[in-house]
C-alpha cells in the first residue's frame, strides 16, 4: 500500500505540474501586460444561458482553465439555511442553489452532533482550523475551483480548503482493494460518463471533516456519489448521494447549482495567515 500511495502521489504531482505549465505562464504574462483583469468573483447561476460547450471528443467541457466554478454560499446541503440557498422563489435569478429540502434519517449520535454544532455556533468546525473541507463540502464553499479533463482523469483545483487538488480517475479502473485502509479527506474517486453527466464514486474517507458547514457528520464508512452536469454555459448541476451507515439509517440525496465565472483563476489562499485568534472562537 505504501508503494502504491507513493506512486499515486508522484503521479498526482506530475499531473498537477503539467497542468500548471499549460495554464499559469500565460496567465502571469497577461497580468504583467495589464491583461489579467478578472470579473466578479461571486456570481449566481444565470437563467436563459447558452448551451454548454463541448470537447473535441464530444463530451461536455467542464471548464479546462477558461474560468472557474463558484458555489456562492451553501451552509446546509439539506436545504435548511441562509438566504439564497434556502428553498424559495428566486424569480428570474436563475437556477436555485440547493434545490430541495431533505431530512436525512440520522442515527441518534449524528442528530445530537448537528444540534450541538448549532448550539455552540460551529466553534469546532474543522475548516475554521484550516483543515480540508472534505466531500461534498469542498464543492459548496465560496471559493472558486477549476476542473480539467485529461484523457484518463479529471483534475479539480480548489482555491479554498487548504488549496486542495483532487484526482478523479476515468480510465476504467475500479476502486483499489485497500482504498479504505488509509483514509483521507477526499477519499479515492473513480469517474465515468453517463451521457452528459460525469458520475464520480468516492470511498476511503477519514472522519475528520463535516459534510457541510451546518455540521452534518460522517464516519469512515462514507460513500459519496456525485453527478456533475454542465446544463448550460453558465451552470453546473451537482447531484450528491450520501451513503454512510455509520451516521445515517439510509442513503440520502441532495443537489445544487453553481455558477460559471469566465476568466477567473484560483488565487493563492493561505488560510493560516488569517487564522490568528482561534483561542477566542468559543461559540456559546
Show where each model-derived region lies.
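N-terminal secretory signal peptides that target proteins for export/translocation
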Residues: 1-8
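Bacterial N-terminal signal peptides
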Residues: 11-22
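PEST-like low-complexity, intrinsically disordered acidic/proline/serine-rich tracts
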Residues: 23-284
